[in-house]
């Protein structure tokens, strides 16, 4: 179960991602399991609409902007670059919080 704090963050994350070249995003890790602490970061697995046009500066800027919006450290992991050894754990924990063109995400 997502904590009230994480539930309150999701609409802000969704609004931000809608302005960026992100196709879909999943919350994973301690926040998706309801086990976060005040020191926990927010782990996001994202798929970009056109990843070959995003520079490291673009991605770094997205991280900084998200951190300002939600007041927490953010780890932004590209789905295509997720290492195979981590895939099973991430897939087990992940909760879809954004998909381009969808107006309601459960």
Where are each of the predicted segments found?
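Catalytic core of pol beta-like nucleotidyltransferases
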Residues: 1-26, 32-38, 49-106
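Short, conserved active-site loops that position catalytic residues or coordinate cofactors/metal ions
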Residues: 40-42
